[in-house]
Structures are given as structure tokens and as C-alpha cells.
Amino acid sequence: MAMLNDTIYALSSGAPPSGVSVIRVSGTLTRDILFQLVGSVPAARTASYRTIRTRYDQPVDSGLVLFFPGPNSFTGEDAAELQIHGSKAVLAALFRELGDIPGVRMAMEGEFSRRAFENGKLDLVEVEGLADLIGAETEMQRRLAVEQSAGGVSAIYDSWAERLTRARALIEAELDFPDEDDVPGSVSDMVWADMARLRHDIALHLEAASAGEIIRDGFKVVIAGAPNAGKSSLMNALAKREVAIVTDIAGTTRDVLHVDLDIDGYLVKLYDTAGLREAEDRVEIEGVRRARVALRDADLVLLLVDMSNPIIPADLEQALPHVTVGTKKDLIETASDRYDLQISTTTGEGLPELRDLIGRVVKERYGGQSLAIPSRQRHKDSLAKCLAALDAAISQGSANLELRTEQLRLAAEYLGRITGRVDVEQLLDVIFSEFCIGK
């Protein structure tokens, strides 16, 4: 990122108007800025009530000013926060003053966090956890983000990297000093036994990645069935608002509709699909095609069957995993045991039980485990490459020790790419672009 030596500023709180706005400043000119705006530098990490003035001594506003000397700040640089009234006019006036100071500019997306990374205050996993915490909408997303941003996952990767480094050091010592008494005997046996245990630990960790992805990106539930089975009515009932158009005309839904739900702290992505049948209308044919794609990608299928006219499309007879839901219970007199659950969107009967069932399915598959798990595809990719390098090192028992040691070096490098301990310059712009300006 260019201009890392500039001093930067940005609004780090919500958009105005608001009761209070927080302006964040970071860089070598922070002290000079405070002298110009409030007349002096407040005591470190102490809130001081000050009047903020222009260079012409005109008051802009009054508020709390805090100074954080580097390296003991979020960014590792001298930094400050100005807590002022959240008026658009007040912010515009303050930004004019800041923008007119040479060497001071508005921050770019994620630049405060980028500087924290560059100055060793955060690693990449912690940065991503912070971004996820800011964007968290469910309780499980919050918990996962806290685990990542607090360094719990990074500590695991660092400990694994240390084991790889020690293994390489012991092997190289044996290669360089084969006759020295202070090199432990049978070092190869010790190293490869530990590497086998490490491989097992990483494999188990990688298996948990699906839980991290579900918590972060959502558990996909697809509502499917024949036309007029009540799919759109169920989506509207679970969303508690009108997401889909509901009519008595078969084939009303032509596209895949989507709504996010919070069920027991998990993000559940609910999809309403076109009724599955042999369609002739070109638009409906495309809708049915998209419905089949959604079914293929689903974590759970709710197979809806109109109990007053039970039809199960052939596409859905073998759909797994699925829950068979009988609909329009208010229109039948005799209950049937062929359904996992029976509901009526008209009366609301069975809807709480359906929400509970979805929650149980998610928790049975992904709950009850540590949240120190991979949460992003790039984590999975690097862990898989690390595992492959370890496999190569362990399995090539007859190979030259130097070649096997090189595989251990590659395994450590892939781990380092997750946290940013090794060169990941090409990743940084992508990662930090996820932040808003003031973070």
C-alpha cells in the first residue's frame, strides 16, 4: 500500500447524523494535529474535554480527545480519537481542517488495520476475525470472530510452525554433525513420530473447517416441492414478512428467492425455489433449472408435500439430506405418519417445531466443538497444502533426508501464509478491502 508514511484520519463510528461521532487519526503527525486542533497533546490514554478549533481560531465543536502514543496503540503508531457531535456539518468542518494539513489524508478501506498488521499488532487471522466481528449478525458468528480476533487460532498455527522448525533443526543437526555427542540419538525416529502426530492434529483441524464456513457463511436450507405445495407461503411465514409472491397459480415462483434467518444463533440461509415439474414456459424452465442447482448445493432440503394433493417430484425422492414436511394441515381431517412434520402456514401450526428442527440439525452437525477452527477458504487451502507437504515428508522414508526436510519447510511456509508470518503481499489488498474506511 502506497503512502504508509502519511498520517491518516477517518470516521470510525456510524454514519451521521448521530449523537456522537468518533474520528480516528494515526501517524507521525498525530501530535502536531492535536496541537493545531486543541492546543496541546492530552495525557496518554486519558479522555480530555477540549474545544476543537480551526487554524483561524474559530470553534468547530467541543468533545472528548484521547491520545495513544505508539507503539502502544491499535496501529502501533501515534494515534488519537476525537469524540464529537455526530453532525454532518461538524464532520465536514473537521475534515476540511484535517485535509488541509500537509502530509495528512483520508484513510483508505482497512488502512488502520493494515497498519496494525504491518507494525506487528495483529496477524492476518486476527485481522480477518476483527472484520468478521464487525460484520457479525448472529451469536455464533460473534463467538467465532472473537476466537479468531483474540489470537486463539493463530496460537495453534504458531505452535505447529514451531514443531516444524524444531524438526528441521534436529534433522539438519544430524546431517551436519553426524558424529557429535550432543546431537540426540535416534533423532529421525523422534522427529518423524512427532510429525505423524502433527499430521493427525492438522487433519482433524481441517475437518472442522466446514463448521467454520457454516457459521460464517450460513447453513443453506432449500424449500422444494411440487408447484403449489406451499413453498413461498412457508418462506414468508419463517421470514415473518412477505418475501415471495403467493398465489393459487402454479408456477408463480420463477427464480430462487433467498432470506437470512437467525436460528439458535446460527445464520440460516433459506431459499424458496420454483416448483419442480416438466415446464414448457421458457422462463419457468430456467426457474426449474436453478431450483435443481440450489438443491445440489443445499445443506438441508425441506421437501414440502401438499397433504391435500400429495405429489413428490421424482427429483426429490432421493434428495439427501431432507426433511419431509406435510403442508396445508388445516385442509385435512386425518393426520398421516408419512411426514417428518406437518404444518399450516395459515394457522401457524407446526412452524415453531420446524424452526426447532432446523436448529437441531445445524447443532447436531456443527455444534459442540471448539471454535478455534478455520473460517475461510484461504485457510483451508493453505492447511491442505501444508498437510500434503507433511504427507510427502513422512511417506518418503527412503528418500534423501534433505528432500524430506524441504517438504517440512514448505509445510511451515503454508502455515505462515495463514497468519501472514511469511510473504503474503498479494493477499493484503484483498483482505483489507473488506473493512470500512475507519477500521
Swiss-Prot record:
Major localization listed first in the record, in broad terms: cytoplasm
One annotated Gene Ontology cellular component of this protein: cytoplasm
Binding-site residues, K(+): N228, T247, I249, T252
Residues engaged in binding (6S)-5-formyl-5,6,7,8-tetrahydrofolate: R24, E81, K121, K439
Cofactor note: Binds 1 potassium ion per subunit.
GO biological process, one term: tRNA wobble uridine modification
Binding site for GTP: 228-233, 247-253, 272-275
Official protein name in the record: tRNA modification GTPase MnmE
Protein source organism: Rhizobium etli (strain CIAT 652)
